[in-house]
């Protein structure tokens, strides 16, 4: 075994390359091959140059002017009058201004002749014929209230109609069909078809 002072061993070690582990020399050598990128923030002048060359952000545009449409918050129908009377004087127009609204029971209360006819039809009590009690019970009137109205001298049918004046005549006609009172439905149908169009038009003309 060769000793540390062996001249052959010393000669062999002199021929082998020695690795340089000095970090300072390594960093200089790597910087020559791979330049270090500057990741710092751009200078003020560079920022001004970049901003001047960049197009404006689309998000900064006024929202009302996107796609070349003018900014407007007005009602598109503001220039159109919704309550303009119809100019057709022939009576054949079917526009909303000329068409009468759906009649309510409160409209029936203005026709005394019609009320008298309905009262005569619905006031009497018959064992097999439905009357005002069935109508009122169907629309939610309690039993005690039914008995109370029946004892009063006034017509219970008229009282029933007064308490349901906001309902439509169409709903009242449905009750007539439900309880097979075709005689009352026929009276109401004739009034809706013949009398109400004139009354409805006169009521509409009062608004103009």
Curated annotation (Swiss-Prot):
Compartmental location: Cytoplasm
Record carries keyword Amino-acid biosynthesis: no
Highest taxon above the source species: Eukaryota
Biased composition (Polar residues): 49-61
Chain residue ranges for the region called Disordered: 1-99
Effect of substituting residue 145 to K: Reduces binding to EDAR
Every Death domain range: 116-195
Keyword Manganese included in the entry's annotation: no
GO biological process: canonical NF-kappaB signal transduction; cell differentiation; hair follicle development; odontogenesis of dentin-containing tooth; trachea gland development
UniProt biased composition (Basic and acidic residues): 1-18
InterPro entries recorded: DEATH-like_dom_sf, Death_dom, EDARADD
Subunit structure: Binds EDAR. Self-associates and binds TRAF1, TRAF2 and TRAF3.
Function: Adapter protein that interacts with EDAR DEATH domain and couples the receptor to EDA signaling pathway during morphogenesis of ectodermal organs. Mediates the activation of NF-kappa-B.
Entry protein name: Ectodysplasin-A receptor-associated adapter protein
Source species taxonomy: Eukaryota, Metazoa, Chordata, Craniata, Vertebrata
Gene that specifies this protein: Edaradd
């Amino acid at each position: 075994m060769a000793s540390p002072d062996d001249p052959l061993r010393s000669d062999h070690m002199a021929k082998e390359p020695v690795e340089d582990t000095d970090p300072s020399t390594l960093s200089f050598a790597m910087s020559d091959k791979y330049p270090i990128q500057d990741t710092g923030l751009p200078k003020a002048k560079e920022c001004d140059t970049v901003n001047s060359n960049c197009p404006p952000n689309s998000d900064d545009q006024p929202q009302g002017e996107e796609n070349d449409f003018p900014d407007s918050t007005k009602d598109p129908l503001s220039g159109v009058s919704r309550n303009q009377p119809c100019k057709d004087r022939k009576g054949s127009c079917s526009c909303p201004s000329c068409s009468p609204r759906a009649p309510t029971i409160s409209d029936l209360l203005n026709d005394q002749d019609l009320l008298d006819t309905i009262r005569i039809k619905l006031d009497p009590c018959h064992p097999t014929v439905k009357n005002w009690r069935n109508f009122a019970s169907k629309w939610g009137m309690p039993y005690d209230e039914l008995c109370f109205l029946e004892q009063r001298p006034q017509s219970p049918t008229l009282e029933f109609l007064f308490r349901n004046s906001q309902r439509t005549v169409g709903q009242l006609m449905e009750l007539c069909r439900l309880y097979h009172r075709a005689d009352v439905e026929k009276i109401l149908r004739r009034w809706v078809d013949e009398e109400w169009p004139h009354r409805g038009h006169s009521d509409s003309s009062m608004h103009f």
